[in-house]
Amino acid sequence: MSGFYSHRSLDGVLTDGEITSIYKTGLHRSQKEADKKNLFTMQLTGGNVSYQQNRIRLGITGIYYVFNRPYEPQLTGYSQYNIHGNQFYNLGIDYAYRWHRFSFQGETAMGKQGSATLNRFQYSPVEGTQLMIVQRYYSYNYWAMFAHSFGEGSAVQNEQGYYLGVETSPFRYWHILASFDL
């Protein structure tokens, strides 16, 4: 079991007292960038509870975000499904199961609006060889500020697909990987 709390200032753009853009670079090279420094605050709190016994592992993770000003980005085009307001949350479960040469693991999460899931099934027919399939589904309206996951896009949002892979080491110092993404 673990928990956390954070209170920090963030960079961004304020328009009429509302956050319209959040900058994550941390760079302040010019006066224009310096003017966007520490304009609002964010508080985070959350935790994780995990259980493991023999071949099974289960966990629950939650995070709650609060901005001191409302977040109201311009909602046009691809960003029309982004979140807005000043309070957000994400709740997820993670799971894993191993049995002989098989393993299954994944995580499923939900937010204020959408959901996301990533699952992997792996089989090792012989020592040094692995076959795997990774399934992902990230709904168009899912949002998690600190999420990073396997996928084609840079955001954990609006994507679904399957990744198939074979990995083997037939000889010493040889490592062969073949994969494709559907």
Predicted regions: what they are:
Residues 38, 42-73, 80-182:
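Exposed, low-structure sequence patches enriched in small/polar residues
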Residues 34:
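Conserved catalytic alpha/beta cores of large enzymes that bind or transform nucleotide phosphates
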Residues 23-28, 72-79:
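Flexible, solvent-exposed loop segments that connect beta-strands
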Residues 1-13, 74, 78, 101, ...:
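Transmembrane beta-barrel domains of Gram-negative outer membranes and organellar outer membranes
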Residues 1-29, 38-40, 44-48:
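Aromatic- and glycine-enriched pocket-lining scaffold segments that form the walls
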